[in-house]
Amino acid sequence: MMLGLVMSEKESASEVIFRIEDEIAKSEGNFDSIFVSLKERFNTAELSTIYSLLLGGIKAPNFLRRLICEIDKLREKRNLDDLIDFILDCDNKNFSEPAEYLNLKVLCIKVISNYKEIKAVPSLLYCLNDRKANYKLRLAAAEALGKIGDKNAVESLIDVVSDEDEKSVYVRESAAIALGMIGDSRALDAFVGILEAKKSFLNKFTFLKERILESLSKMDFAGNRRALNAVKKALEDESPQVRINAIETLMNSQMDEAVGMIKKMLLDCDVEVRKNAVIALYNLLGDEILEEIIQDETLSEDCKTEAQGILDGDFEEDYE
């Protein structure tokens, strides 16, 4: 490779790009030698500058994908601005397949989230709130906001998760997950409202309720009667997975009523729900409740088998 003069003061940015574009054309999709050569010749600051030029000028999707991953490894702050510019750029770089550009933007957002820099939040909020954008981009933006954890994103995430007109339930799910990661109590009312809603689509597509219960399990709602009643209602949901998630939420709630509610689930019609109730009670009460379950003649054999298995240590890793 002829990359020795890439940082020459006599070379313009366009010449740098042209030089590496020539190497890309010869590489046949294997870009290892290009990046190995760059890393051998240039220090971190110089690499950051080169990566910035390449991200702004190269149009080869496969190379850009590798470049974005290399930027993630380098994680220089100056390249964060480059990544933000990339996701906000409306130009599709003349890609023959628009899906390629979309996938690169989604990858950029994931890398941006790894920086965990608050300065990226406004741009991510823009992506999240852009109803014309592909749902994959908005979903990635929601997940990134949760990972960064800035509470300035909470209101927008609440708006998305509460929006009954939102076409993509997946975006609402991602917003719910992000709110759980941030852990701000302002989301409680929105979560409870959705669990209380009698919407037919929620019964058909239960994933949103599942995600909300998962997020509630990470939040402190002790003393919030409305939230407790909503979780209690979820124990009666038609979906076994919703009932399982409600059990886990109660287990993590540290509320006095939790044990009694979970004990009732030992009589649930679904075997997996019953097993999860056993596990939850063990996590709350220890070995003593397992002995009680084994001796209880009113309980099913699967409950007893699950309890005995935990006592015997057969599935120890599952309960740690």
Regions found by a protein language model. Name each.
Residues 8-21, 41-55, 76-95, 117-129, ...:
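Amphipathic alpha-helical scaffolding segments comprising HEAT/armadillo-like alpha-solenoid repeats
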Residues 275, 279-316:
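Leucine-rich solenoid repeat scaffolds
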Residues 206, 214-218, 225, 229-236, ...:
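Alpha-helical adaptor scaffolds
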